[in-house]
Amino acid sequence: MAVLVHITSIENEAAIKRAGIKPGYRNVVFFMPHMKDCFISHQWARELKRFGIKNFAAVDFKIPDDEEIWFGKYHLQHEKMELNKAISLFMNAEDKLGYEFFIDRKIEPREIIKIRKIPKPMGWRYQPHAHGKKPCPCPRCLQAGGYKTKKLKVSQ
């Protein structure tokens, strides 16, 4: 069984210890395989910061290798497959940025190994490889009240 990591707010620590990780956005639990390269394992933390999380925690857990999970690149079609197959595809990918793993069930407290504080969020913002590219000015991509949103709308 591989060790997996779910990034959340440190404020959820007590609830997670008591009741496990409950499905949130889209009724799923997002996670990544735990790797030596923290940038890859924690790549979603910086994106989560945009939604108001200030202090982060990494929840390490294990689920059976043959469990069905969803896997794919951000904003692309995801496939349902066994965890071990998804991890194998991920580990062999040339570019590991932007991949998502999620499961459509609760992670039970007995499956949790440990919860640890992450010192600061790392990873990409908006989308992988966005650094140095101008943001898309379409209304779907621009968030109301976002950084330089007004300026981007005027420059269209």
Tell what function each PLM region has.
Residues 1-30, 37, 44:
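ADP-ribose/NAD+-binding catalytic cleft of ART/PARP-like enzymes
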Residues 24-27, 36-156:
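Conserved NAD+-utilizing ADP-ribose enzyme module
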